[in-house]
Amino acid sequence: MSIHLKPNCHFEELPPYTLMVAAAIVKAIQRLTGINTEIKWVNDIYLNNKKMAGILTEAISSIESGRITDVIIGVGLNFSISDFPKELANKATSLFTSEKPSITRNQLISEIWKLFLTIPTSDLVKVYKEKSLVLDKQVTFEQAGKTYTGVAKEIGDKGQLLVLTDD
């Protein structure tokens, strides 16, 4: 599912769209099914330590004005898949696997976009912290071509992951 927004603002003024969608997904699933999912980084949603959904946010800017004119947010969510290929079976999952879904795709989509539009920005980091898969765990990341390892200690007020590195 995708949504096309036209914010027409400077980059610094953009709402944290990816975080907004991630929070909306985990809250919608919890509300409609009682199933607890988690946020890894900010663009991946996990269920039972396996990836269930991914979020991709792309922005288009105007060279003349320097403003972000368009934002497209795409969400891939495994809704009801019972069998994954062998190479994905240990790392991917679906909201519903062998059981019959208790909700429809349309119900879930509707709830996600409703929450996307209504979760207060001030609550986004709180949801991310509550649903984080990585806080207090060892993580590895790359920055400027160098690989770092450390422990994810905190999520900043703009959704950034703060890591205490080994060096």
Predicted regions and their residues:
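Long, positively charged amphipathic alpha-helical accessory segments at protein N-termini or as interdomain linkers
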Residues: C9-F11, L19-T37, L47-D167
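Primarily the active-site beta-strand->alpha-helix module of PP2C/PPM metal-dependent phosphatases
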Residues: M1-K6, P16-L19
